[in-house]
UniProtKB/Swiss-Prot annotation:
SUPFAM superfamilies: Radical SAM enzymes
Recorded GO CC terms: cytoplasm
PROSITE patterns in UniProt: RADICAL_SAM
Residues reported in the UniProt entry to bind [4Fe-4S] cluster: C142, C146, C149
Listed HAMAP family: RNA_methyltr_RlmN
Name under which the protein is recorded: Dual-specificity RNA methyltransferase RlmN
Enzyme class: transferase
Amino acid sequence: MAATEIIIERTPQARPAAMTGATKPTLIGQTREEMGEMLREIGVADKQVRMRVAQLWNWIYVRGVSDFDQMTNVAKDMREKLKAHFTIARPEIVEEQVSNDGTRKWLLRYPPRGAGRPVEVECVYIPEEGRGTLCVSSQVGCTLTCTFCHTGTQKLVRNLTAEEVLSQLLLARDRLGDFPDRDAPVGAMVPNEGRKITNMVMMGMGEPLYNFEEVKKALLIASDGDGLSLSKRRITLSTSGVVPEIYRTGDEIGVMLAISLHAVRDELRDLLVPINKKYPLKDLIEACRNYPGLSNARRITFEYVMLKDVNDSLEDAKGLIQLLKGIPSKINLIPFNPWPGTNYQCSDWDQIMKFADFINSAGYASPIRTPRGRDILAACGQLKSESERMRKTERLAYEAMMIVGHGEDD
C-alpha cells in the first residue's frame, strides 16, 4: 500500500478576524427580513434598506467576502458603519487536514454563546467524479446515544445557530476556491470544472431535526437562488427518525431525506437507535411514505450499518424489503467502523455482498459505502470535537463513506 500523504495546517490560537467579531451580531444566517431590520436599527433609511440588503446578500453569498472593506460598490461611510456594528467573519480554523484521496476535514471553533467555553465542530469535504459533497454539523455533540456510533458518545453541548451551520459551507468554499475570482488549492483533488461543492449533507455531528428552526433557516439560505444557490435536490438532511419534524422538513424545507435505519424490528432498533422507543418503525415509515415529492428521481436514502450477527442476516434483508415496499428508496449499506470500546463487529464481507445482492435483486439500488479519508480520521460515525475525541493513534476514521453519493443530479 502506498504511503499515506496528509497535510495538516494548524492555525494560531488567536485569529483576530474570527474572534474579535464574535461579540458583534452577525449578518450571516439572517433572513432578508431580519437583515433589513438590523440595518434599520443602525440608522439605514427605510428607502435604502431593500437595496442594501440586496448588496449585502450578493457580497456575502455570491462573492463570498468575509470583510466589509471588500464590498467595493458600498460607500465607505456605510462600510464603516457596518464594520462598527456587525461581523461577517468566518469561524476559527483549529486544524485543516487533507487526505491523499482529496478528502478534506476542518476542525472549527466557535464562540461560547452560553456554553461556557468555545466549542468545536468538524465538517468534511469529499470529492468525487463530477461532484463534491460537504458534510455539515448541526449540533456540538449529540443526544441520541446510538450504540454503534462513536459521535454519540459525546454529550450535547449546544445547538449550532443558522450562521454557524452556514459558515461551514462558506468556509469550505473559501478553502476550495469555490467563490468567483478565487484560486483552487494546490495539491489534493478537487473538481476541475464547475463548482467544487455541488452537494451538501446534514450528516455531521448532531441530530439536525433536534435543531429544526436553525437548520431550516440555514438550508433555505443555502438553497436561495440569488445566493449560494444549491439545488434542494442536492441537499440531503439525515435524521435518526424525529417523526414530527420529518413532516415539517418536507413541508417547510423540501430537501432530500436520509434515514438512519439500521434495523427492521423495533426490539433491535430500540437498542441500536434509542429514539425508536419514542418514534417506532411504524410511525417512521408512515412519515417517509408521506414525504412530499417522492418519485424515482426523488428517493429517500436509508442508511444501514452492517453489524456482524446483529442485523446482517438474509431474514433482515427480507424484512428490509418488506418494510420499504412502495417507498422510492435507495439503501446505503455501511460496513461498521470499529472503535475502541465498542462491542460490535463489522459483518463479514461475503455476508455484506449476499445482503446487497438480495436487496439489488428486489429492485433497490444498494451501494456498499467504501472508506474515504481514513488517513485523516474523517469517516462515518467517528466525528467528534477535539476536546472529546480519542487519541488519534486509537481512532479508525471512516465517516466519509456515509457522505458520498447523496442527493440527485439535476
